[in-house]
Structure formats: C-alpha cells, structure tokens
C-alpha cells in the first residue's frame, strides 16, 4: 500500500492544542483502518521565528513540497508584533501558498443542524446550508502591478492597486470549480463585475468558454458579485459552488461563513495545479479561525475547525470520501448530543474543553467506522 504523506504545522496560539486532537484521529486511521498515513512535523509562524529567525525554514518548506498534503494550524500573536515585516508570522503562510503554487482557495459554509439557532438569519433560510466558495488566490488586485502610493506634489497623494487576470488563471480556477461541482450538486455560479470591470468581462468570457469546451455537463450561471452578496443573505441555499476572483472571494467567503453563525468552526483548503503524472494537487488545509493567543494554553479552544480541515484533506487530497463523510458526521453528531466548547456553549448544553471535544468526536467517528 502506498503511503500517504502528511506534514503537520501546528503553528502558534491554539494551533498546537487543536492539532493534538487531529493527531488522535490520524492515529486511529492508521491503527484501525490501516490507511498508512506518514506524518512529519515542522514549525511555522512565530515559533519558527523564535527557532530560526524566519517564519518558516527552508528545511520545513522542503517538507511541505515533498508531502502529499499539509495541515496548518494558526500563526501570530502579540509576542511577534514588533518583528520585521518580512519575517512576521503570517509570512510563513504566504510563503507556503507561494512556493506550493496554491491558487484555488476552498471555503465551505456549512450549517450544522444543532447550531442553526446561532445564525442571525431565520432557521428556514439557513438550516441544511452546504455551499462552497472557490476563490482564486494568487492573482487579481492583491498582486497586480503597479501597487503604490504616489505623492502628487500638491499636498495630495494617489493610491494605486491594479486588478489583473490572464486567461490561463481564469481557466485553471474554472476547471477546479467544475470538478468540485461534479462531486456535489453539479452547479457553479460564477461571480464578477463585468458591468464595470474589464477583468470581469474577461473572467466571464473565460469561464463560459471553459464550460463549453470541457464541462458542459455541469450547470453554469453568472451573477454580478454585488447581487451575489445580496442573494447569499436572501436565500443562500440556491448556491452550490460559487466561483469568483481574489477580491470578491475574500469578501463573499467571510459573508458566507458568518451565515452559519460559527465562523470559528469552519475549515478551508488551498489547492495547486494537478500533477501531470499522478493527477494529484499540492494542498494545504487550515481552520478559518486565527491563533487566539488570549485563550492559548488554557485547554478551552474549539478543535472542530481543525478536525474538519482533516476531513477536507481526506476528501480532496486522498479520495477517502467515505472516511471524510463519517468524520464530518461525527462532528455533527457530537453537536447534536449537546457537547460544546466555551465559544459555542449555551444554556442546556454540556461545556467541555479542547481534549474532551476531540475525544468525543473521535469516539463518534470510531462508532461510525465500526
């Protein structure tokens, strides 16, 4: 049996505590299900700066490039607020994305039935929500040149950011969207601002052409991004996969995540190009939440987003769909049982710590895997 190579990068703050619960699940996948995961560990973020003077070492970057997949915790904290900009903790994540050439960011928005009341929307609008926002991660206005502030010499300044997309960038992210839709409900909604932006016109043309050329079996609709934001709040369950650029994806994915009322419980994935020989994509999985230094080391952090990130990893990097389904069902089942960490606790539920939540999910996963 071929081994499955995983690099674990716990990072800073609550990252190590959450990753400890993931290790338990991986141990079970190996010992009881014989799935052959090989794990290595490395440093990223502030802890890497403390050890090496940089946010990720070249050696750990090599481990990331050699792995089938990377599981990332969280980085940052006030301890490193004054370090030089180029070695700040967040630079470790940026280097991982850049060197691994991760251009497709997947942000699911899932409403767990037991937490439907946590949303600011009516339960009938949000209950059963399961959508996926696919954001182009390496192009667009965040990376386009020129990017500068110019002194106009008359007491005025001008800030310049440039939105740039090439056809190949649009085509490759569109391919990912259609591939993902086939594994879900077979629908892609592409969002841009073609009415006022030339890059939006090209985006629309590129997605349409790619659909006609390679993916005509998938339903495709186009929507202006501002209208898409409105529809996300009005009736989010109309969507399956939302495909959009870097800027709009940044905005819309946070809107979609908060629909669920549980931003800190959601996972994400960043994927790269498919290998020409194996078809596998480089991938990094991480919780949406930050490092939460204020609660680090207290044993009260919620590990659900980190465990859900492992479920995404099983699904998208290793094709272990049944195992991913069971792990996600285990999370939902524990929530149905009223087990809560402090961040999602309410009257009438059972408050537990990080370890207890991880143990409960693992026990449920074991029962579902029997």
Swiss-Prot record:
Cofactor: Mg(2+); Mn(2+)
Source taxon at top rank: Bacteria
Binding site for substrate: 97, 107, 135, 226
Metabolic or biological pathway, per its Swiss-Prot or TrEMBL entry: Amino-acid biosynthesis; L-leucine biosynthesis; L-leucine from 3-methyl-2-oxobutanoate: step 3/4
Keyword set, alphabetical order: Amino-acid biosynthesis, Branched-chain amino acid biosynthesis, Cytoplasm, Leucine biosynthesis, Magnesium, Manganese, Metal-binding, NAD, Oxidoreductase
GO molecular function (one): NAD binding
Gene Ontology CC annotations of this record: cytosol
GO process terms (BP): L-leucine biosynthetic process
Compartmental location: Cytoplasm
Annotated cofactor note: Binds 1 Mg(2+) or Mn(2+) ion per subunit.
E.C. number: 1.1.1.85
Top EC class for this record: oxidoreductase
Pfam families: Iso_dh
Record family assignment: Belongs to the isocitrate and isopropylmalate dehydrogenases family. LeuB type 1 subfamily.
Subunit structure of this chain's protein: Homodimer.
Protein name (Swiss-Prot/TrEMBL): 3-isopropylmalate dehydrogenase
């Amino acid at each position: 049996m071929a081994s499955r190579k995983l690099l674990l990068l716990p990072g800073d703050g609550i990252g190590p505590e959450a990753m400890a619960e993931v290790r338990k699940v991986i141990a079970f996948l190996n010992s009881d299900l014989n799935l052959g995961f090989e794990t290595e560990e490395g440093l990223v973020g502030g802890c890497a700066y403390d050890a090496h003077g940089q946010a990720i070492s070249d050696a750990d970057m090599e481990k990331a490039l050699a792995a089938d997949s990377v599981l990332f915790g969280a980085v940052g904290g006030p301890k490193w607020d004054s370090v030089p900009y180029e070695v700040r903790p967040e630079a470790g994540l940026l280097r991982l994305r850049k060197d691994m050439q991760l251009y497709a960011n997947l942000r699911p928005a899932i409403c767990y039935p037991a937490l439907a009341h946590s949303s600011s929307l009516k339960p009938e609008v949000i209950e059963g929500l399961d959508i996926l926002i696919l954001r182009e991660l390496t192009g667009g206005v965040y990376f386009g040149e020129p990017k500068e502030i110019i002194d106009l010499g008359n007491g005025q300044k001008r800030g310049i950011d440039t939105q740039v997309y090439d056809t190949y960038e649009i085509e490759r992210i569109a391919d990912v969207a259609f591939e993902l839709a086939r594994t879900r409900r077979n629908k892609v909604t592409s969002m841009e601002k073609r009415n006022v932006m030339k890059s939006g016109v090209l985006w629309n043309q590129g997605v349409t052409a790619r659909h006609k050329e390679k993916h005509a079996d998938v339903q495709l609709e186009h929507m202006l991004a501002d209208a898409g934001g409105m529809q996300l709040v009005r009736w989010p369950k109309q969507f399956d996969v939302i495909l959009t650029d870097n800027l709009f994806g940044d905005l819309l994915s946070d809107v979609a995540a908060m629909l669920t009322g549980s931003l800190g419980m959601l996972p994400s994935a960043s994927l790269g190009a498919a290998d020409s020989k194996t078809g596998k994509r480089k991938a990094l999985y991480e919780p949406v939440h930050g490092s939460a230094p204020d609660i680090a080391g207290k044993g009260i952090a919620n590990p659900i987003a980190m465990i859900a990130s492992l479920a995404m990893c099983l699904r998208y990097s290793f094709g272990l769909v049944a195992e991913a389904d069971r792990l996600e069902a285990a999370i939902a089942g524990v929530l149905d049982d009223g087990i809560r960490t402090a961040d999602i606790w309410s009257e009438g539920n059972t408050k537990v710590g990080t370890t207890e939540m991880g143990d409960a999910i693992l026990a449920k996963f074991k029962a579902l895997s029997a």
